[in-house]
Amino acid sequence: MASPLYSVVLGLAIVSAIVAPTSSTSRGTLLHHGQKRPQPGLRVDLEQVDSGKNLTKYELIKRAIKRGERRMRSINAMLQSSSGIETPVYAGDGEYLMNVAIGTPDSSFSAIMDTGSDLIWTQCEPCTQCFSQPTPIFNPQDSSSFSTLPCESQYCQDLPSETCNNNECQYTYGYGDGSTTQGYMATETFTFETSSVPNIAFGCGEDNQGFGQGNGAGLIGMGWGPLSLPSQLGVGQFSYCMTSYGSSSPSTLALGSAASGVPEGSPSTTLIHSSLNPTYYYITLQGITVGGDNLGIPSSTFQLQDDGTGGMIIDSGTTLTYLPQDAYNAVAQAFTDQINLPTVDESSSGLSTCFQQPSDGSTVQVPEISMQFDGGVLNLGEQNILISPAEGVICLAMGSSSQLGISIFGNIQQQETQVLYDLQNLAVSFVPTQCGAS
């Protein structure tokens, strides 16, 4: 899929409910940025986009890597052109779906959960062009709580690109893989399992081209901008816990009071906001060690520059961790030197540092990789370091980014870890755990 579905990814308990509007013709009373919703506590299951498909574990891995590679390139393209394009371009693809329902009575659909996008959108009837989705396309005429957004509304003004037609706020989003969604902005009641939240601003997509590669019917933006779900709910924190690829257990997303705190001493990193790229969550990486050896990569390698280049983004929808070429080369060389296995070529899978496992089944001593954040050291587990694209082959789950120097902390390095975004205190914390455990 594509990225506002840009490009991506809740078991649920909301502690506060709000009464939905009863008129389908009224504009509705919107909560603008100065107003606070009651702090909800939301917990929702997530599933990997290829879940339920008849694919081998190796096929799952290869598909995820290809999506992540496209997404990384799209993020780079967006950052390169962030200074003056009329129609924004967002990252394509995503990895985790969440089930939601929309309207009164409600209509269920799955959407990509994406920390690299702000807009919430789904396909709407009548469609000029819509892609195939596994659930019925939402028809606003069937809902009593639906209301279009006028052009003067704050949420319309928050769009990076909008037009006005008969006081109807229209949007156009383009994705790095060539996909586009066009439609109009509205508000509607969204239901997460059994709890409903009214007046959520979203895009009603009537012309959606190039999507349909996953199971989703839209996108739930979890980025830092005012149109995202965390911003609209007014929550100060959210967290997710993603299970490893191939796990039968669901991943989870929690918002507000349901996003539990972290144990004292857990590794953390400062969140940095970029005025040039306000959607993304930038984190502060200072160095990397392999097998206990500090590689001497300058911290400036991962710093966000004044012109919007560089920096490290934490992203739910990118599969591998991507580093600037010199940093990646240093990690790959140190890892290769220490693992002491013969190398193999798996470049066709999008992986550059791969090894042949011992034919006798003997145990491989995997060098530990540690990410040195400004708030502590995150020691990656073996499942966060290695990935297997083929029988008897293991690969370093990292890659090199483009000449732009952007770094992305991908979802393999975040799996089996509770990742907490504290938006009030500007920090991300990491708690290694078994995400699928009840």
Swiss-Prot record:
Main localisation: secreted
Summarize the thermal behavior of the activity: Optimum temperature is 45 degrees Celsius. Thermostable up to 50 degrees Celsius. Retains 44% of the original activity after incubation for 30 days at 50 degrees Celsius.
Q: Which UniProt keywords apply?
A: Aspartyl protease, Disulfide bond, Glycoprotein, Hydrolase, Protease, Secreted, Signal, Zymogen
Read off the Gene3D superfamilies from this record: Acid Proteases (2.40.70.10)
A biological process from GO: proteolysis
- Activity dependence on pH, as recorded: Optimum pH is 3.0. Retains 80% and 60% of the original activity after incubation for 30 days at pH 3.0 and pH 4.0 respectively. Unstable at pH higher than 5.0.
Signal peptide stretch: 1-24
Which Pfam family, an example, fits this chain? Answer: TAXi_N
User: What is the role of this chain?
Assistant: Extracellular proteinase found in the pitcher fluid of carnivorous plants. Digest prey for nitrogen uptake.
Protein name in UniProt: Aspartic proteinase nepenthesin-2
User: From what organism does this protein derive?
Assistant: Nepenthes gracilis (Slender pitcher plant)
